[in-house]
């Protein structure tokens, strides 16, 4: 299973991303971390991400050999495709890093980078709710029980695709695939940090959000967005 990367499985960790950084700084190979439970998970902007036992907490770490653009979007597309193949669920994508199923967030992507010595390292963190308690209704899940064989297949498939991203070999037509699976294509959205309302119409060459307002195109590089009707 572990050709081309070192794999570590844990019962419980604080953060799979933190563990991944500790491992990758002393490794020549790529590193994958999987935990059955994560007690101090986080999302973008240090938001807390609950990762109780029975879900997927995963991190993929590598040494940067080149500048990688739109990494969060590409990783999200990989996760979406792997969930479709392994679990037969049609998950949608929300810019820039959320996974949506039945109008609720069921997971997300967190990209973090650190420099050790002169070498930049990047970790792609992935959190996915397989099945959560019904009282946590503000989150969604894909309503699948934890079966380690399926999780193992998912990890292998996802890791091989993330290796392609890390090595600069990702599908050149990925933006069309991403847009075809976007949950808010041609929908009105709100930019969280400015409260500006735009119509989402596409992506820039580096993964920027392209919005339309009063006939003028706007490019958003960094923010979260709100979409009416989603969680």
Residue ranges, per PLM feature:
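Active-site proximal loop and beta-alpha junction motif in alpha/beta enzyme cores
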Residues: 7-9, 95, 129-131
């Amino acid at each position: 299973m572990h050709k081309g990367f070192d794999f570590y499985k844990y019962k419980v960790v604080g953060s799979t991303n933190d563990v991944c950084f500790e491992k990758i700084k002393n490794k020549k190979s790529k590193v994958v971390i999987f935990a059955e439970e994560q007690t101090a998970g986080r999302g973008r902007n240090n938001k807390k991400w609950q990762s109780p036992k029975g879900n997927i907490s995963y991190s993929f770490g590598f040494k940067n050999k080149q500048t990688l653009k739109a990494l969060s979007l590409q990783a999200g597309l990989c996760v979406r495709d792997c969930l479709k193949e392994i679990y037969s669920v049609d998950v949608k994508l929300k810019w820039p890093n959320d996974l949506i199923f039945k109008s609720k967030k069921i997971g997300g992507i967190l990209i973090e980078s650190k420099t050790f010595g002169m070498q930049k390292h990047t970790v792609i963190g992935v959190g996915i709710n397989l099945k959560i308690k019904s009282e946590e209704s503000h989150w969604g899940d894909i309503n699948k029980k934890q079966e380690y064989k399926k999780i193992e297949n998912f990890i292998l498939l996802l890791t091989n695709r993330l290796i392609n991203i890390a090595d600069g070999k990702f599908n050149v037509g990925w933006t069309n695939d991403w847009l075809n699976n976007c949950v808010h294509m041609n929908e009105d959205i709100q930019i969280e940090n400015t409260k500006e309302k735009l119509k989402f119409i596409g992506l820039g060459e580096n993964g920027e959000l392209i919005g339309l307002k009063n006939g003028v195109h706007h490019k958003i590089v960094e923010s979260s967005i709100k979409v009416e009707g989603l969680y």
